[in-house]
Curated annotation (Swiss-Prot):
Name by which UniProt lists this protein: Catalase-peroxidase
The EC number(s) this enzyme carries: 1.11.1.21
Cofactor binding: number and manner: Binds 1 heme b (iron(II)-protoporphyrin IX) group per dimer.
Subunit structure: Homodimer or homotetramer.
UniProt cross-link Tryptophyl-tyrosyl-methioninium (Tyr-Met) (with W-92), position: Y215-M241
Function (record text): Bifunctional enzyme with both catalase and broad-spectrum peroxidase activity.
Source organism of the structure: Ralstonia nicotianae (strain ATCC BAA-1114 / GMI1000) (Ralstonia solanacearum)
Length: 724
């Protein structure tokens, strides 16, 4: 017998082999609700990153980064003797995965370190950038996260080349595993583009045009070197990143004012990406067999373009070249489509040979800024007014690198800009004395005596708070934006009922505030949440349980002028399984949309389960449909949803294309209940059924109420960053 045959693991170690997902690829995936647990986090349980960052000597870090910029390493030499352009690309690509559709992606968790992003074709050779940073990360340790360090390095890179940045905020906390909740597309090959249908309609929520790209194909759509067609892709992709035309032009031109692309030779000379590379590569990828594989011989995108005569110094030369020459199509040494200036002198410096010069070159997507009429108008203004260009780029860069951080309350450090920006969803600071315990009790009594039902109170508070997205920290009850456009008109918020509830609560607010002295007030944002808490307490009382739902005042009311209607439109629920709502019919089944919503609310599977069961019996369905209201005691916080769902005396059959179901008595055939896929999944999915059985047991009523209250409190406070 050979040594190999004695190995007890014939085929795979723990976690190997055929998975449940392989057997049942359409199985509802609950793992996305249990990411980033303490079991994957190496930090101490009491570690507070915000406090650690506050102890950081940011000026010292920046000095070390500044020295790094011009300390070229033989193993990966700096172009033009300066790593700044490489680090700008690293920071840009860290932040640039953000998309507005679901708020996922972005720089907030340092995901560029992990698959798939660390191995995307568009991130080729950024592994070297992070390795160059390791000595600085090692020096400052846990006081600065990788997520913060990558963005800070991009800022220092810009500053080291003469550009004045708008500011920097820390506060991005690292995670320790890939984010499994982000849908990057269904393509199974790099640079695939099955995400398009019809007349180049891009699948939501995606923003990038091809699998493995951050934004658009720099050669043009699918490699077609058409600047006008490329402009269409640029406009859609950048809009899905929350950028308007001016911000888009500023970012492209600003970023391409520095450095170069790399296409010294044919891409087939590349080795595998980091995740596929051999163990001896130690996490590095794209080892090239072309020449030395680095410096003059480096290959990254396959394009070989240097935009300006000042690749390591801020200037207006990008626009000077863009408008100063006519351009003709050519190919890089790697065979990629790019453009070269006609009738031009060789004015562009070589990245590694001080004696060599090159002709000006541009990408197809650069020429879009000249030949698309709207982009051209902005570009020409920037060309003629460099100070406007510098300001626009500084602001757009700050937005790009901070968009997924949420409100300013999360910003840390001495370089946080004083100016509040509309895209930060500003909320006024608390400017009055807050209500106390006695006030809270008195307000609850007024609310419960107002004639509003438990259902109305709970529904309104849920609608206000559940807009929160843990992906980009937007939404939530703070600000009371449910009373403003666009939220007040969303179908999911039942505008007619909402107006009635708000009118009643505003009356209570006015009476209370008018009777106070000493500057004490209650905001409508607080009152909406307090009303929901009062509704939950009353529902528990109706079921025979005396509970006090936690409530902490301190929310404020935003103004319409502080609310970007277009920006907030992306928060509108297309589905909310917690309220048995779908705006339309979608490719994804309703239960998958429920899990997606739960993940954005940072809920676990047990929390999702108890909230659905509780909200059903509290009669909070949008439109007051009876689907899933498995109780004869609505507005009582009972575990009836689970008891009746698990009742084997009920037989379920589809009635409407397998989206709506009838539950009939097995013996008599009499109709007992109706339910949706979201309701029935808690009986059909083995994990969810196991949770439903906990709450459907005879001894579970008290636990059910406790767990519902805890999960409710969590959702109501998701945006209370002041309480963290």
């Amino acid at each position: 017998m050979t040594t190999e045959s004695k190995c007890p693991f014939k085929h795979a170690a723990a976690g190997g082999g055929v998975s449940n997902r392989d057997w049942w690829p359409n199985q509802l995936n609950l793992k996305v609700l249990h990411q980033h647990s303490s079991k994957s986090d190496p930090m101490d349980t009491d570690f507070d990153y915000a406090q650690a960052f506050k102890r950081l000597d940011l000026a010292a870090v920046k000095q070390d980064l500044l020295a790094l910029m011009t300390t070229s390493q033989d193993w990966w030499p700096a172009d033009f003797g300066h790593y700044g352009p490489l680090f700008i690309r690293m920071a840009w690509h860290s932040a640039g995965t953000y998309r507005t559709g679901d708020g996922r992606g972005g720089a907030g968790a340092g995901q560029q370190r992990f698959a798939p992003l660390n191995s995307w074709p568009d991130n080729a050779n950024l592994d070297k950038a992070r390795r160059l940073l390791w000595p600085i990360k090692q020096k400052y340790g846990r006081n600065i996260s990788w997520a913060d360090l990558m963005i800070l390095t991009g800022n220092v890179a810009l500053e080291s080349m003469g550009f004045k940045t708008f500011g920097f905020a820390g506060g991005r906390k690292d995670v320790w595993e890939p984010e499994e909740d982000v849908y990057w597309g269904s393509e199974t090959t790099w640079l695939g583009d099955q995400r398009y249908t019809g007349d180049r309609d891009l699948e939501n929520p995606l923003a990038a045009v091809q699998m493995g790209l951050i934004y658009v194909n720099p050669e043009g759509p699918n490699g077609n070197p058409d600047p006008i067609a490329a402009a269409r892709d640029i406009r859609e992709t950048f809009a899905r990143m929350a950028m308007n035309d001016e911000e888009t032009v500023a970012l492209i031109a600003g970023g391409h004012s520095f450095g170069k692309t790399h296409g010294a030779g044919p891409a087939p000379t590349w080795g595998p990406e980091p995740e596929a590379a051999g163990i001896e590569e130690q996490g590095l990828g794209w080892s090239s067999r072309f020449g030395t594989g680095k410096g003059t011989d480096a290959i990254t995108s396959g394009l070989e373009v240097t935009w300006t005569t000042t690749p390591t110094q801020w200037s207006n030369n990008f626009f000077q070249n863009l408008f100063g020459y006519e351009w003709e199509l050519t190919k890089s040494p790697a065979g990629a489509h790019q453009w070269v200036a006609k009738d031009a002198a060789e004015t562009i410096p070589d990245a590694h040979d001080p004696s060599a010069k090159h002709l000006p070159t541009m990408l197809t997507t650069d020429l879009s800024l000249r030949f698309d009429p709207a982009y051209e108008k902005i570009s020409r203004r920037f060309y003629e007014h460099p100070e406007q260009f510098a300001d626009a780029f500084a602001r757009a860069w700050f937005k790009l690198t901070h968009r997924d951080m949420g409100p300013r309350a999360r910003y840390l450090g001495p370089e946080v800009p004083a100016e509040a920006l509309i895209w930060q969803d500003p909320i006024p600071a608390v400017d009055h004395k807050l209500i106390d315990t006695q006030d809270i009790a008195a307000l609850k009594a007024r609310i419960l005596a107002s004639g509003l039902s438990v259902s109305q109170l709970v529904s309104t508070a849920w609608a206000s708070a559940s807009t929160f997205r843990g992906s980009d920290m937007r939404g939530g009850a703070n600000g009371a934006r449910i009373r403003l456009a666009p939220q007040k008109d969303w179908e999911a918020n039942q505008p007619a009922q909402l107006a009635k509830v708000l009118e009643t609560l505003e009356s209570i607010q006015g009476a209370f505030n008018g009777a106070q002295s000493g500057g004490k007030k209650v905001s409508l944002a607080d009152l909406i949440v307090l009303a929901g808490c009062a509704g939950v307490e009353q529902a528990a009382k109706n079921a025979g349980h005396a509970v006090e739902v936690p409530f902490t005042p301190g929310r404020m009311d935003a103004a319409q002028a502080q609310t970007d209607v277009e920006s907030f439109a992306v928060l509108e629920p297309i589905a909310d399984g917690f309220r048995n709502y779908q705006k339309g019919k979608y490719t994804l089944p309703a239960e998958a949309l429920l899990v997606d919503k739960a993940q954005l609310l940072t809920l676990t599977a047990p929390e999702m389960t108890v909230l659905v069961g509780g909200l059903r019996v509290l009669d909070t369905n949008i439109g007051q449909t009876r689907h899933g209201v498995f109780t004869q005691r609505p507005e009582s916080l009972t575990n009836d949803f689970f008891v009746n769902l698990l009742d084997m005396g009920t037989e379920w059959k589809a009635t409407d294309g397998r989206d709506v179901f009838e539950g009939r008595d097995r013996a008599t055939g009499a109709l007992k209940w109706t339910g949706t896929r979201v309701d029935l999944v808690f009986g059909s999915h083995s994990q969810l059924r196991a949770l439903a059985e906990v709450y459907g047991s005879a001894d579970a009523q008290a636990k059910f109420v406790r767990d519902f209250v805890a999960a409710w409190d969590k959702v109501m406070n998701l945006d209370r960053f002041d309480l963290a």
